[in-house]
């Protein structure tokens, strides 16, 4: 493919439950099927040498779902980490986790830390799994850290700018997304990367996440390649 490619893609993997319900299956079966799509898109990113992929796996609002579904999602996440970590490492994938880890189980937190430590030197792809995250939480938490840094005398008030503030976000060290993808027909970003998506190209598709395959990913990349990214400026033709 000769057209330009995004270097950081952020994905809201929506529609697992609706996919299952449309087939007369329990919602949890949709979450299981969604893992296959995760693997497909990771492989696509490796093939196309895309440097960073962020997957919104669990939002801070998802705790309001039925307890049985939340528990299943946490167990599925833990099981997938244990099962896939060696393969991810062998393919040169660096795992990172964005979000508030404190409410997660100690077992899951340890597995996440171990995965980050094991893959920290890998350079083929950054796989950023976003868990228990909300964009408002990220900004408020960053503001608190920034205020504490100023009060401690480590930073002057007049030194604060956008670049400095971004260093206190949970995504510090990662580039801002070039392309945002949301599946299942919802036309919103749902409190995901509110700061980071300021100039990101948005792509929405009606396809449920378990049906989002290599072809659907290619369509998103083609759409991105047709965009004129202006970052608040005007194009040369205007």
From Swiss-Prot:
One Pfam family it belongs to: Prenyltransf
Enzymatic reactions: 8 isopentenyl diphosphate + (2E,6E)-farnesyl diphosphate = di-trans,octa-cis-undecaprenyl diphosphate + 8 diphosphate
UniProt keywords, alphabetically: Cell shape, Cell wall biogenesis/degradation, Magnesium, Metal-binding, Peptidoglycan synthesis, Transferase
InterPro entries in UniProt: UPP_synth-like, UPP_synth-like_CS, UPP_synth-like_sf
Residues binding substrate, per UniProt: 15-19, 27, 31, 59-61, 63, 65, 182, 188-190
Note on how the cofactor is bound: Binds 2 magnesium ions per subunit.
Function (record text): Catalyzes the sequential condensation of isopentenyl diphosphate (IPP) with (2E,6E)-farnesyl diphosphate (E,E-FPP) to yield (2Z,6Z,10Z,14Z,18Z,22Z,26Z,30Z,34E,38E)-undecaprenyl diphosphate (di-trans,octa-cis-UPP). UPP is the precursor of glycosyl carrier lipid in the biosynthesis of bacterial cell wall polysaccharide components such as peptidoglycan and lipopolysaccharide.
Family named by the database record: Belongs to the UPP synthase family.
Protein name: Ditrans,polycis-undecaprenyl-diphosphate synthase ((2E,6E)-farnesyl-diphosphate specific)
Originating species: Legionella pneumophila subsp. pneumophila (strain Philadelphia 1 / ATCC 33152 / DSM 7513)
Phylogenetic classification of the source organism: Bacteria, Pseudomonadati, Pseudomonadota, Gammaproteobacteria, Legionellales
